[in-house]
Amino acid sequence: MAPALSRSLYTSPLTSVPITPVSSRLSHLRSSFLPHGGALRTGVSCSWNLEKRCNRFAVKCDAAVAEKETTEEGSGEKFEYQAEVSRLLDLIVHSLYSHKEVFLRELVSNASDALDKLRFLSVTEPSLLGDGGDLEIRIKPDPDNGTITITDTGIGMTKEELIDCLGTIAQSGTSKFLKALKENKDLGADNGLIGQFGVGFYSAFLVAEKVVVSTKSPKSDKQYVWESVADSSSYLIREETDPDNILRRGTQITLYLREDDKYEFAESTRIKNLVKNYSQFVGFPIYTWQEKSRTIEVEEDEPVKEGEEGEPKKKKTTKTEKYWDWELANETKPLWMRNSKEVEKGEYNEFYKKAFNEFLDPLAHTHFTTEGEVEFRSILYIPGMGPLNNEDVTNPKTKNIRLYVKRVFISDDFDGELFPRYLSFVKGVVDSDDLPLNVSREILQESRIVRIMRKRLIRKTFDMIQEISESENKEDYKKFWENFGRFLKLGCIEDTGNHKRITPLLRFFSSKNEEELTSLDDYIENMGENQKAIYYLATDSLKSAKSAPFLEKLIQKDIEVLYLVEPIDEVAIQNLQTYKEKKFVDISKEDLELGDEDEVKDREAKQEFNLLCDWIKQQLGDKVAKVQVSNRLSSSPCVLVSGKFGWSANMERLMKAQALGDTSSLEFMRGRRILEINPDHPIIKDLNAACKNAPESTEATRVVDLLYDTAIISSGFTPDSPAELGNKIYEMMAMAVGGRWGRVEEEEESSTVNEGDDKSGETEVVEPSEVRAESDPWQD
């Protein structure tokens, strides 16, 4: 065997301590990150020696070459890994945790585990409780000395347990205890033990430059003190001899804060807030040292007036006195741990207000427990009011879902892992005993488990919303829809897998119900026998929808049309495509079928106006893709519709409003506009005569241009040049009203006066019907 190689890892301050001839004990200061045991060989070739020097344990690593082994590939020597302990601790402390403040969560969790262990063991050994007092945790910050002291009345530790638990990196005493509990099903059936990785204690060095642990186990008569400083590979253990520091039972941890962290973490209010955030639902009372004020009654001497004799009179008054005392920080109990049948509605509302700092009662709640691959308890709430900021609708990081593991807060910073973005308005708590977390307990590890949880949470949320929609009190769902309807519409776009759950919850105004919202189920129930589709129209307002020319024939035939008046509505409906085998049809697009067409009449109309359609298309050129006879108009002369795959007027308006709108796409999509004409309208009949009898007429051409421009506006589009359109209208108005009510041109009037015509003041009134002569060229 090769000679042993030795390397001392204890820090330089130890060299100044005189070495006393005390026995040196061999202890394996192991790390779960290093291979040891049967993986290499039974004999230990890399041992950690704890040399006791003046009660200080210094870490030494003796790395030895293993015996030569012969394998199929040939002979070779097997080595074991070595580690720089101070560097390893630095990596554990500063690389695992993203926030310094989690040190308090970890230490409180350790204290809770110690109390749980004592409670379990006392079932069979009641003597362990002794006179150690109530099971509790106390946290006392000291801003003057820059320290935080955390005391629990739990199981404590013996000297051997101190070395084993605090001297062994990644050695979890809780994990060992849980393993023992599993062997005893009666004791281990129900526990609240939290720790599992064996590194949480070292998070104290996130904020502390020195940590002192004083502990007293009911199994031992002696109390021991463990001390260590940051960036050191050694620690000290001594027996406590000062009677003022003797504990009846439990553990006291004192953190000597770093200079940069004293002002933040030695402040009492900060500590209280951290406890409320991370450890509010720990199963044992947590008291924090807080400054309080009280009003006391005192006696004061009344001032003696001049000339008066005798002793001054006493008068009673009050003053405010400040003092320090213990305050319970976790008074709110974990409501989700109780049976839902035993909890009153008022308790749910009160818990909601305290947990989420709300002032309104929630609109609804659901309390459930799931079992199977993942077991967890949860309470979900629908708030009484929606977000005031529209950005919250599209922001998945709303911190509304709080994840707990064994009632210890883990995180509320989820980027859509637990809840989809469109359900981000839901608030609630999720608590599990067996979630796969990373070592820092800040991130969920296993995506499969997360997917299962997400699926169940979504299903329960939809069940809760469905109950509101089916409630006898219709105002509840009306309130829900006003506040959160936009979120569900977003779900139509983002979650195709849940369309069947989302679609029945949608509500819209319609041509038959402009005051109350209607559901798609009600729409289908009211459909006629020949109606095969769900018709909708997207506009910018309810007023615009009601006056749109697209509706004319549908209203005449008593066909209901849904009004989509919010920007997200049209995209949401387009993503749904169908509901209960009924297609969604936009009535502002080409090829509209109403289900009761008269094919003979339609064919005759197309034949009669086929020449006019070609003539108008020739006049308009590339402005429209084609011109055709309409089956959707009854009172308007024409309407401009979009191509089947093009943007509607509403969508075009929204895309133009985008800050980074794609102009090339806009030009491509708008090129499929189609002008539809009403064959029964007088203007169209006149133009039909004009195209046959006077196709070169400039007046007819001007009418076509103006007809197209007005169709742009009435159909919801935006004209390219409003000023040019205005001039055309003014010109046509001048033609229509010029001289009609007695006005004459100034030149005409002046020439008449010069000629002395005494009839110049008389004006002949001509009726419009008399203007058209029998030989009008536009007549057939």
Swiss-Prot record:
Family matches, as NCBIfam families: PRK05218.1
Transit peptide (residue range): 1-60
PROSITE patterns, A to Z: HSP90
One term of GO molecular function: protein homodimerization activity
Known function: Molecular chaperone required for chloroplast biogenesis. Essential for chloroplast biogenesis and maintenance, and thus for embryogenesis. May be involved in the disassembly of VIPP1 for thylakoid membrane formation and/or maintenance. Cooperates with TIC components and other molecular chaperones to drive transport of preproteins into chloroplasts and functions in the chloroplast stroma to facilitate membrane translocation during protein import into the organelle.
Subcellular location: Plastid, Chloroplast stroma
Gene Ontology CC: one annotated term: chloroplast
PANTHER family assigned to the protein according to its UniProt record, in alphabetical order: HEAT SHOCK PROTEIN 90 FAMILY MEMBER (PTHR11528)
Keywords: ATP-binding, Chaperone, Chloroplast, Nucleotide-binding, Plastid, Protein transport, Stress response, Transit peptide, Transport
Chain intervals with Basic and acidic residues compositional bias: 769-780
Region: Disordered, residue numbers: 742-780
Disruption phenotype: Embryonic lethality due to embryo development arrest at the heart stage.
Similarity comment: family membership: Belongs to the heat shock protein 90 family.
SUPFAM superfamilies reported for this sequence: ATPase domain of HSP90 chaperone/DNA topoisomerase II/histidine kinase (SSF55874), HSP90 C-terminal domain (SSF110942), Ribosomal protein S5 domain 2-like (SSF54211)
Tissue expression per record: Expressed in roots, cotyledons, young leaves, mature leaves, stems, flowers, petals and siliques.
Miscellaneous comment as given in the Swiss-Prot or TrEMBL entry: Plants over-expressing HSP90.7 show albino and stunted leaves.
Induction remarks: By heat shock and light.
Protein name: Heat shock protein 90-5, chloroplastic
Subunit structure: Homodimer. Interacts with VIPP1. Interacts with P23-1.
Amino acids binding ATP: E106, N110, D152, M157, S172, G173, Q196, F197, G198, V199, G200, F201, T251, R441
Keyword Nuclease on entry: no
Keyword ATP-binding: yes
Organism annotation: Arabidopsis thaliana (Mouse-ear cress)
GO biological process, one term: response to heat
